[in-house]
Amino acid sequence: MFKKVDRKASRQKKQMSIRNKISGTPERPRLSVFRSNTNIFAQLIDDVNGVTLVSASTIDKALKGSIANGGNIEAAKAVGKAIAERAKEKGIDAIVFDRSGYKYTGRVAALADAAREAGLSF
């Protein structure tokens, strides 16, 4: 018989493998991405102190009015730009990118590219 592939468990296994290799510091925090079917979330995390420094998502009041659908590439670009602007306000220029087990394509890549264009280096 065929084994059913558990996509969520597979992604979480990849996520833990990635998480063991990268870590965020106060000078260079980790940009963690989470995507659902309807929204996308990004946050800059300092793993040394265990705190979130900056966050942005499609459910933020500032972005929700300008985005019709939170689950598409345009919304991911808006979140990437917003997180980069908020990071710049806090004096953060360099980050470590954590794709959280998702393939680097589509919404995840769009968010990363928009953050790079807005001035974050990784």
Curated annotation (Swiss-Prot):
Belongs to the universal ribosomal protein uL18 family. Disulfide bonds: none annotated. Residues 1-16 have a biased composition (Basic residues). Gene3D superfamilies: 3.30.420.100. InterPro entries: Ribosomal_uL18_bac-type (IPR004389), Ribosomal_uL18_bac/euk (IPR005484). It comes from the Bacteria. The gene is rplR. Keywords: Ribonucleoprotein, Ribosomal protein, RNA-binding, rRNA-binding. This is one of the proteins that bind and probably mediate the attachment of the 5S RNA into the large ribosomal subunit, where it forms part of the central protuberance. GO terms for molecular function: 5S rRNA binding; structural constituent of ribosome. It comes from Fusobacterium nucleatum subsp. nucleatum (strain ATCC 25586 / DSM 15643 / BCRC 10681 / CIP 101130 / JCM 8532 / KCTC 2640 / LMG 13131 / VPI 4355). Part of the 50S ribosomal subunit; part of the 5S rRNA/L5/L18/L25 subcomplex. Contacts the 5S and 23S rRNAs. Residues 1-29 are annotated as: Disordered. GO terms for cellular component: cytosolic large ribosomal subunit. GO terms for biological process: translation. This is Large ribosomal subunit protein uL18.
